[in-house]
Amino acid sequence: MITKVMNQKDWEKGKQTGEIIEDSLREEGFIHCSSLEQSTEVAKKYFSNEAEVVLLVIEPDLVKAEIKYEVASNGQKYPHIYGVLNVDAVVNVIAFRKENGAFVLPATLDYK
């Protein structure tokens, strides 16, 4: 499984259209994703000012576009989706909440 941190508004739009298209896809050619373990750091870095954030749990085998694991400037490998993300590849959506100013994953998480 891979994950995608995004704001609730963009997720709602994606559900309406059946696909997620981000600015990064237009500008860099791919959609940024992460592992579950990397997701809290991603949320902290890019979504600290967002009120409503969700964590999409994605089944890679259901993603129609190519997924490449690439090394970022911090030395970690991240999954990048080279095309639109079809929403039927999203197998779970989790409200990503802050506790004491930090994003925290739920204690029980359906992550296969």
Give residue spans per PLM region.
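Conserved, structured core segments of small domains
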Residues: 1-112
